[in-house]
Amino acid sequence: MARDRQPVLKKCRTLGLDPSILGVNKKSKRGLRPNANRKLTDYGIQLREKQKARFVYGVMEKQFYKLYEEATRKDGVTGELLLQFLERRFDNVIYRLGLSNTRRQARQIVSHGHLEINGRRVNIASYRVKQGDVITVREKSKDLAIIKEAINQKSVPGWLSFDENALSAK
C-alpha cells in the first residue's frame, strides 16, 4: 500500500508542527515557510488540521476518509471517534507502547512481522486493536536492538499496560 515518503522536516515546516511530536530530534534551520503568518480562512484551518492528523498518524487520504465515514455513522462525537480509530491502529499502539521511537519505525516493525496479536502474527499496520487483545513480540524478534533501545526511552499511556520482562501488552 502507498505511504507518504516526503521528508519529515519539510512537511513539519509546511504544517507548522514541531518535529519532536513525531519522535524526530532534529530542527529545520530554515524556520517557517513564507506566508506562514497570513490569516487562514475557516476552510484553510480545517484543511491544515486534517493534513496534520494525516501526517502525524501516517495515513493516506483515502484511508483517512474511510475512517471519517465510519466515525460519522457511529453514535457520538465524530472527531473524538475518528481520533479513537486512529489511536487504535496497530502501528500507533506499538509507538504508544514504546516499542519504537517513531510511528514510521513502528509501521516497519509491524510490516516485517516482528509482533503477534493473541498469538497470531499480524503484519498489517492499519489493523485495529481491540480492547483485551494481547500484543507480544515474537520469540525470534526479542533480541532486536531497535526494540530493546526503544523500550528504555518511553512511558506507556494509561489505557495500555506493558510487561517489559515478557515483552507483551494489553
Residue ranges of predicted features:
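Short glycine/serine/threonine-biased micro-segments
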Residues: 96, 111, 117
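Short, well-ordered loop/turn sites that connect or cap secondary structure elements
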Residues: 103, 109-110, 129
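Ferredoxin-like alpha/beta domains used as RNA- or RNAP-binding modules
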Residues: 1-97, 124-170
